């Protein structure tokens, strides 16, 4: 009989989808196991016959499914306003590029967000965060990018820090100052990039407000040369990087980000084979964002078969934002990734667990159920992981465990 230490907590009579690639079964499934949690981490996974049947800190889950906590590795959670009117314009024939050129798009949200009080932004973002938590999300990336000036970018990152301080969910904050050219720099995008590189990145990094730097390399964002200035600045300071690339056209953004060993290249609908090879060589995760693909009614699919062939890890995220993916649901993103992009349900699960963890640089601690990893997991009223992907309108979450505590 396995001896437990005071303070140990056990979840027994469970079916574990460990998402551990070292296990041979699909989803890393193992039956009739018990999960021992100690000091917020998984201490061990053992056959349940090695443990007492009952006790003060022993939870009998009656055969329920347990998975790692979900990870949403790409969101724009902190913003004010909405862009419903733009959506109607697009449905009446206007393109995303045309709307952006007329001062809409990202800059419309920038105006609303700059004018919004920090406490109001916090309350709006907190409600969105808790919606994701209710689906089993335990680690969440939050980008800035709706300030496009030092003061408001800092305000957005402070909101992310305040959300993290609640200890309800892990937050990975990302500086996305190179999201768009603000109206006041419309005729001088290079000047804005200078502001980002010489002021925003170093000052906000010194304050410890973000974990990584992101950028938007696209015809409606920044060109390759401007994007590289951002990457060079970040890497000179030792900051991990990532990029929104190849969403609407092929500019070579994936190759650029991979050359700087980027954590991830996101969107990637127009990614070509050279870009896929560069991602493999750079250790860069491909992040699929099917919500934006759906909402913009795009037709160019990301090259899933090429990503498989080159063994590039593929993550899936909600891309929750007011303009192009107003879907605060990782379950829906998983379903869309399967239906629209052809992922298997197991690939979708890997995309919101171990590969999403890698996209945030957390692969050594998050995204799998194995000894030494964080005790962030979800108990589901389900028999198979596919059920969560198959029916996104139904949430079979039974229990969410964060840092070893039922939350």
From Swiss-Prot:
It catalyses: 4-imidazolone-5-propanoate + H2O = N-formimidoyl-L-glutamate. Binds 1 zinc or iron ion per subunit. One of its GO terms (cellular component) is cytoplasm. Fe(3+) binds at residues 74, 76, 244, 319. One of its GO terms (biological process) is L-histidine catabolic process to glutamate and formate. Its cofactor is Zn(2+); Fe(3+). Belongs to the metallo-dependent hydrolases superfamily. HutI family. Pfam families: Amidohydro_1. It is found in: Cytoplasm. Keywords: Cytoplasm, Histidine metabolism, Hydrolase, Iron, Metal-binding, Zinc. Zn(2+) binds at residues 74, 76, 244, 319. Its EC number is 3.5.2.7. Catalyzes the hydrolytic cleavage of the carbon-nitrogen bond in imidazolone-5-propanoate to yield N-formimidoyl-L-glutamate. It is the third step in the universal histidine degradation pathway. Pathway: Amino-acid degradation; L-histidine degradation into L-glutamate; N-formimidoyl-L-glutamate from L-histidine: step 3/3. This is Imidazolonepropionase. Its main location: cytoplasm. N-formimidoyl-L-glutamate binds at residues 146, 321, 323. GO terms for molecular function: imidazolonepropionase activity; iron ion binding; zinc ion binding. It comes from Salmonella paratyphi A (strain AKU_12601). CDD domains: Imidazolone-5PH. 4-imidazolone-5-propanoate binds at residues 83, 146, 179, 247, 324.
């Amino acid at each position: 009989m396995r001896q437990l230490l005071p303070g140990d907590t056990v979840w027994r009579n469970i079916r574990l989808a460990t998402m551990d690639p070292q296990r041979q079964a699909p989803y890393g499934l193992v039956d009739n196991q018990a999960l021992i949690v100690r000091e917020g981490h998984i201490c061990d996974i053992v056959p349940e016959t090695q443990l007492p049947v009952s006790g003060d800190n022993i939870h009998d889950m009656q055969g329920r499914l347990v998975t790692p906590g979900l990870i949403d590795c790409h969101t724009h959670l902190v913003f004010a306003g909405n862009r419903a009117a733009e959506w109607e314009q697009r449905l009446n024939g206007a393109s995303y590029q045309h709307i952006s050129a007329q001062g809409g798009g990202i800059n419309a949200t920038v105006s609303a967000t700059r004018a919004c009080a920090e406490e109001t932004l916090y309350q709006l973002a907190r409600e969105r965060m808790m919606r994701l938590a209710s689906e089993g999300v335990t680690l969440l990336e939050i980008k800035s990018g709706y300030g496009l000036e030092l003061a408001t970018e800092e305000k957005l990152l402070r909101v992310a820090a305040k959300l993290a301080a609640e200890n309800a969910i892990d937050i990975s904050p990302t500086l996305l100052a190179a999201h768009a050219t603000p109206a006041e720099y419309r005729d001088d995008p290079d000047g804005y990039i200078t502001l980002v590189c010489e002021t925003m990145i170093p000052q906000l990094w010194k304050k410890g407000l973000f974990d990584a730097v992101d950028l938007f390399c696209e015809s409606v964002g920044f060109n390759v040369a401007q994007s590289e200035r951002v990457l060079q600045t970040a890497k000179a300071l030792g900051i991990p990087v990532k990029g929104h690339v190849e969403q609407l056209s092929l500019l070579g953004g994936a190759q650029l980000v991979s050359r700087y060993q980027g954590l991830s290249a996101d969107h990637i609908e127009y990614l070509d084979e050279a870009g896929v090879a560069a991602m493999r060589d750079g250790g860069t995760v491909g992040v699929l964002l099917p919500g934006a693909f759906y909402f913009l009614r795009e037709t160019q699919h990301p090259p899933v078969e090429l990503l498989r062939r080159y063994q590039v890890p593929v993550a899936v995220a909600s891309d929750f934002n007011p303009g192009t993916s107003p879907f605060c649901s990782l379950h829906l993103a998983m379903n869309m990734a399967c239906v629209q992009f052809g992922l298997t349900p197991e690939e979708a699960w890997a995309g919101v667990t171990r590969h999403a963890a890698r996209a945030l640089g957390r692969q050594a601690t998050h995204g799998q159920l194995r000894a030494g990893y964080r005790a962030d997991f979800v108990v589901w009223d389900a028999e198979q992981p596919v059920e969560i992907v198959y029916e996104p309108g139904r949430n079979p979450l039974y229990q969410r465990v964060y840092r070893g505590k039922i939350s």
